[in-house]
A protein has these predicted regions:
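Short conserved beta-strand segments at catalytic cores or DNA/RNA-binding microdomains
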Residues: 1-12, 19, 46, 72, ...
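RNase H-like polynucleotidyl transferase catalytic core
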Residues: 68-70, 74-91, 110-112
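Acidic/histidine-rich, metal-coordinating catalytic segments
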Residues: 41-61
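Active-site-proximal acidic segments at structured loop/helix or strand boundaries
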Residues: 98-197
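Mobile-element integrase/transposase regions
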Residues: 1-14, 23-26, 161-178
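RNase H-like two-metal-ion nuclease catalytic core shared by retroviral integrases
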Residues: 47-48, 59-60, 80-102, 118
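Protein C-terminal end segments and domain termini
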Residues: 203-354
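Active-site beta-loop-alpha junctions of metal-dependent nucleic acid enzymes
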Residues: 16-44, 219-223
Length: 354
């Protein structure tokens, strides 16, 4: 992974984020996340001579910026300049920050279940570093100095959308191809043109203004990201193909276990289960299945799942406060009527004797 780091000149405020590559998308996203974190925009940024910022060298000291950098500068309104070649004194500040943050963050922990978790951890480490008192800044920390600097910074802008947008045709496998990797969409869209937004870690697909697919981006060659729910119509026509399908290979491991335990030779019912999941959500369905396992582990069916889901829905309805007020008023009226009725029948007996 590539590490992007921003460091302020005065207060040494540090922001870092990991990306899959060092390309224009990651370069632009790093700025967007940095300014979003700050809540403001620095008026001037100084860059090392990296390829994603410098398109080409025009002369001994002149450099032409890339289109990606120009778009960021135009959108956020900041100015920029580049370090001079072979001038370590100009870029040493940032290079030391790279080494410092990397050592503090990953010296003792380097394995994470996902890039998202790694970035959450890295963000927490940067927050800790930014809270340290600095003797050379009168005992103030980086966050305190940043608050002073914000008075002279540019206003916050909405998050910059760095996506690369393409229009792609859905192939016969019901997938679109981005940089050699396949991503599934709804099987009814075969042959159609879909709008694809490509981010550094995400692929979003739209058809007629509606989002029809979302995938984590793949960076290997000829990798496939297949989602089961995109092929429900096809599998309904050919349920026997379910067990050995690519969609089944990439399904959630918890659902694979449910299939093995309760839906072998019941492929059509398992496909129907995915329709229920699309409506109610995976977590809710898994909770219901867990409840059914405790009651009747050998008899789990879609009908029972639907019944329990409906019960949960009814029990989760919010209490109508208006009805509660009516009920309380009714109780008070009954109490008043009760006070009018004698506790014993002695009075009635005496009245009858008279």
């Amino acid at each position: 992974f590539q590490l992007a780091i921003f460091t302020s000149a005065k207060g040494n405020y540090r922001y870092a984020r990991l990306f899959p590559k060092q390309d224009t998308l990651c370069f632009q996203e790093s700025h967007a996340f940095f300014f979003e974190k700050l809540g403001k925009v620095y008026k001037t940024l100084v860059y090392d001579n990296m390829k994603v910022a410098v398109k080409k060298f025009v002369g001994p000291s002149e450099k032409e910026p890339t289109e990606g950098l120009l778009k960021l500068s135009t959108y956020y309104g900041f100015k920029f300049r580049f370090c001079n070649v072979r001038s370590g004194n100009e870029k040493g500040h940032v290079e030391r920050s790279v080494e410092y943050v990397r050592r503090k963050a990953f010296a003792f922990k380097e394995n994470f279940i996902s890039l998202e978790k790694a970035n959450e951890y890295l963000d927490s480490i940067c927050d800790e570093l930014n809270q340290k008192k600095q003797s050379y800044n009168e005992g103030r920390n980086a966050i305190e100095i940043l608050e002073i600097e914000k008075e002279y910074m540019l206003p916050k802008m909405p998050l910059f959308d760095s996506a690369r947008i393409e229009e792609l045709r859905v192939d016969k496998y019901s997938t679109i191809v981005v940089n050699g990797s396949h991503y599934s969409v709804l099987d009814k869209l075969v042959g159609k043109i879909v709008l694809v937004k490509i981010y550094s870690t995400l692929i979003l697909c739209y058809y007629e203004g509606e989002k029809v697919a979302q995938h984590e981006r793949k960076y290997g060659f000829n990798e496939w990201s297949i989602k089961f729910e995109h092929f429900i119509s096809t599998l309904n026509r050919k349920p026997g193909a379910l067990a050995n399908s690519t969609a089944m290979l990439q399904v959630d491991p918890r659902l694979k276990e449910i299939y093995k335990n309760y839906y072998i030779k019941k492929e059509r019912e398992f496909i129907e289960l995915f329709t229920i999941i699309n409506e109610k959500g995976l977590d809710e369905v898994l909770k219901v299945i867990k409840s059914l396992k405790s009651l009747s582990p050998l008899d789990i069916s879609n009908e029972k799942i639907k019944v329990l889901l409906n019960r949960h829905k009814e029990s989760s309805h919010p209490v109508n406060m208006k009805n509660c007020e009516i009920l309380e008023n009714s109780r008070q009226m009954l109490e008043q009527y009760k006070s009018l009725i004698p506790i014993s029948d002695k009075g009635f007996v005496e009245e009858a004797l008279l």
